[in-house]
């Protein structure tokens, strides 16, 4: 079985993330969406909340599971018997960071490949950070995130 890991903070999950996931499920027999528990980004939502926001949005994919991880990504991938890691590239500016991460992961575990997937161009400027900033200032995020995520952001920021 061809199994991959789609890791991220997903803080919160966006339509861009889901677009990359939709592309990954066409390439692999199983995709594990892996929510990073401890991240230097200082997430707004707990890993349990991020998983809860992801779950209803991945049910349309029968070959997807969602979990969290708190280890080196390649160690987690090996433990899950995955053969690859999926990373979304929105713009060329993402490439340098992702390239260095892919090389480090290959150095740590050469059996795990990194596959770069580009989302639909309509999502190329969407990031979780921007979505949180828009929500914090009362902007409409409904074009960027699923309804349950928009509601969670509204609950945190007290805005609509």
From Swiss-Prot:
Gene field: coaD
Primary residence: cytoplasm
Enzyme class: transferase
Keyword annotations of the record: ATP-binding, Coenzyme A biosynthesis, Cytoplasm, Magnesium, Nucleotide-binding, Nucleotidyltransferase, Transferase
InterPro entries, sorted: Cyt_trans-like, PPAT, Rossmann-like_a/b/a_fold
Binding-site list for substrate: 9, 41, 73, 87
Family annotation (Pfam families): CTP_transf_like
Gene Ontology molecular-function annotations: ATP binding; pantetheine-phosphate adenylyltransferase activity
EC number: 2.7.7.3
Catalytic function, reaction form: (R)-4'-phosphopantetheine + ATP + H(+) = 3'-dephospho-CoA + diphosphate
Record's protein name: Phosphopantetheine adenylyltransferase
Residues the record lists as binding ATP: 9-10, 17, 88-90, 98, 123-129
Family that this chain belongs to: Belongs to the bacterial CoaD family.
Cofactor dependence: Mg(2+)
GO cellular component, one term: cytoplasm
Any GO BP annotation: coenzyme A biosynthetic process
Compartment(s) of residence: Cytoplasm
């Amino acid at each position: 079985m061809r199994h991959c890991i789609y890791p991220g903070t997903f803080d919160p999950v966006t339509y861009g993330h889901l677009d990359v996931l939709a592309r990954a499920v066409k390439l692999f027999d199983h995709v594990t969406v892996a929510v990073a528990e401890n991240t230097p980004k200082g997430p707004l939502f707990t890993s349990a909340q991020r998983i809860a926001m992801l779950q209803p949005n991945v049910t349309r994919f029968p070959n997807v599971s969602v979990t969290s991880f708190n280890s080196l990504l390649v160690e987690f991938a090996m433990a899950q018997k995955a053969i690859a890691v999926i990373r979304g590239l929105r713009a060329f500016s993402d490439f340098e960071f992702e390239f260095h991460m892919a090389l480090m992961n290959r150095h740590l575990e050469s059996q795990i490949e990194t596959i770069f997937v580009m989302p639909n161009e309509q999502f190329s400027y969407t990031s979780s950070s921007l979505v949180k900033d828009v929500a914090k200032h009362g902007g409409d995020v409904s074009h960027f995130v699923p309804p349950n995520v928009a509601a969670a952001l509204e609950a945190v920021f007290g805005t609509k």
